[in-house]
Amino acid sequence: MMGLTEGVFLILSGTQFTLGILVNCFIELVNGSSWFKTKRMSLSDFIITTLALLRIILLCIILTDSFLIEFSPNTHDSGIIMQIIDVSWTFTNHLSIWLATCLGVLYCLKIASFSHPTFLWLKWRVSRVMVWMLLGALLLSCGSTASLINEFKLYSVFRGIEATRNVTEHFRKKRSEYYLIHVLGTLWYLPPLIVSLASYSLLIFSLGRHTRQMLQNGTSSRDPTTEAHKRAIRIILSFFFLFLLYFLAFLIASFGNFLPKTKMAKMIGEVMTMFYPAGHSFILILGNSKLKQTFVVMLRCESGHLKPGSKGPIFS
């Protein structure tokens, strides 16, 4: 019989999954319909749309994992099922993180203003830079997925020894090796984190310099350039903090097998991991003028303040 903890876990998982799917499907529908009408899509819209699609897939993988943990733990821990989930999750997860990083770099190159030759060279070739970054993101995501092979082998040996309940020096050695490889696997997260932090720092410096220039000229600091800086900073900063929360949840879920309350640790980790792909996508909607306007119109239609089909004041 399902207990209170399991019930709360399933309710939270289902709620976050539903909200995440709605938010990311909204992005897909708005950008998809815009592309269908104009047959054109900006680089930022392409990244956001692809990111939303990956997050829909990621949420489905996490929900499947959550239900297997609750209703079929033996199936979840079996070799082939665990490997399929891990491979799917690792590739989708790393690619989505890199796409969010690429989006931050794109905002930085388009909005920040520096006279350094290297920055200007990158700024003038922003489209080419982003194409190479996206290709690099794909290759690094494949590399992180391929690195699971040794981890799977060690996990199989580790579980085989554990099943015999023969806790020997060999068992402890294999467990230590598995810990080490698993921890080293988290190093794949460092490059996108460093790049995001660099983009955030450049935008902060650029905003500070721009604000000082506005004050010296006696003009308002709330000009379009300043607002663009602030909007990009909010998006990158939210990604940074949500990613750290997501990374913590990943560690809890991954090392759940080695904690005293295994199932509880896994459930906490699974619930926390769903917050990032839903929360950051909602922040992307608020930071994108087209998505935000469509979202506001939709809310007004739902509340009865605006008739369906009318544009409303925000489009005038």
UniProtKB/Swiss-Prot annotation:
Tissues showing expression = Expressed in subsets of taste receptor cells of the tongue and palate epithelium and exclusively in gustducin-positive cells. Expressed in the antrum and fundus (part of the stomach), duodenum and in gastric endocrine cells.
The terms under GO molecular function for this entry are:
bitter taste receptor activity; G protein-coupled receptor activity; taste receptor activity
Disulphide connectivity of cysteines: none
Q: Write out the GO biological process terms.
A: detection of chemical stimulus involved in sensory perception of bitter taste
Q: Does the keyword Transmembrane apply?
A: yes
Task: Tell me the keywords, alphabetical order.
Answer: G-protein coupled receptor, Glycoprotein, Membrane, Receptor, Sensory transduction, Taste, Transducer, Transmembrane, Transmembrane helix
| Listed GO CC annotations | membrane; plasma membrane
Q: Which residues lie on this side of the membrane: Extracellular?
A: 1-6, 64-94, 150-186, 256-266
- Transmembrane intervals: 7-27, 43-63, 95-115, 129-149, 187-207, 235-255, 267-287
The highest taxon in the source lineage is Eukaryota
SUPFAM superfamilies in UniProt: Family A G protein-coupled receptor-like (SSF81321)
Main location, first listed in the record: membrane
Q: Hey, which stretches end up on the Cytoplasmic side?
A: 28-42, 116-128, 208-234, 288-316
PANTHER family for this protein = TASTE RECEPTOR TYPE 2 (PTHR11394), TASTE RECEPTOR TYPE 2 MEMBER 3 (PTHR11394:SF49)
Chain's role: Gustducin-coupled receptor implicated in the perception of bitter compounds in the oral cavity and the gastrointestinal tract. Signals through PLCB2 and the calcium-regulated cation channel TRPM5.
Other notes on this protein? Answer: Several bitter taste receptors are expressed in a single taste receptor cell.
Identification of the protein by name:
Taste receptor type 2 member 3
Organism classification, top ranks?
A: Eukaryota, Metazoa, Chordata, Craniata, Vertebrata
Per the record, the gene is TAS2R3
